[in-house]
Design a protein with these regions (language model features):
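Flexible, surface-exposed loop/linker segments and immediately adjacent secondary-structure boundaries
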Residues: 2-47, 51-154
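Pro/Ala/Gly-rich low-complexity, hydrophilic intrinsically disordered segments
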Residues: 157-167
Length: 167
């Protein structure tokens, strides 16, 4: 009986979802989410929908982001997040270089930086802006990658990559 109980509980710990992020703070936040949404909550992979306000989330990798509502983000792993809609400001320390932020239109690989991404699903546009540092923006349909550095922006609209602009 004790062995069965041990096997059942150890199986629970072996197969339970890993905690990949923590909500650091919220400001005037109103949520629609199955995941916990109070500051200090540890998060497993899943989707967060922020109707209004701001939320600061830190991933176990050390990467962190501020989500501005209305927004929807899917936490995939400590090194990968998907912005479905809305705006996010991302900060990636050295230990999290290689962090990936996906959007419906492309994705950014971080090389140690602060950057912002906005997704408008109605207009089918994803915009990327580097505040400080460097990212690579990838367009999966064409297979192209564009490197952005300080104050550069690029957008992908309806599958077309716009030229870089100085911000």
């Amino acid at each position: 009986c004790v062995l069965v109980l041990f096997l059942c509980t150890s199986g629970y710990f072996l197969f339970s979802e890993p905690k990949i992020a923590t909500i650091q703070s919220c400001e005037d936040a109103a949520w629609e989410s199955d995941l916990p949404t109070t500051p200090g909550s540890e998060l497993i992979p899943g989707t967060l929908k922020l109707r209004t306000g701001l939320a600061s989330i830190e991933l176990r990798s050390g990467a962190s982001f501020v989500l501005e509502g209305p927004a929807e983000v899917e936490l995939i792993s400590a090194m990968k997040t998907r912005l479905v809609a809305g705006m996010v400001m991302v900060e990636v320390p050295e230990q999290a270089i290689g962090f990936v932020l996906e959007t419906p239109d492309g994705y950014a690989i971080d090389y140690g930086t602060r950057f912002a991404v906005a997704v408008d699903p109605i207009k089918n546009v994803s915009s990327f802006e580097v505040i400080d540092g460097e990212i690579g923006v990838h367009h999966p349909v064409s297979g192209s990658e564009v490197r952005l550095v300080d104050n550069q922006t690029i957008s992908i609209e309806k599958g077309i990559v716009s030229p870089m602009k100085e911000g």
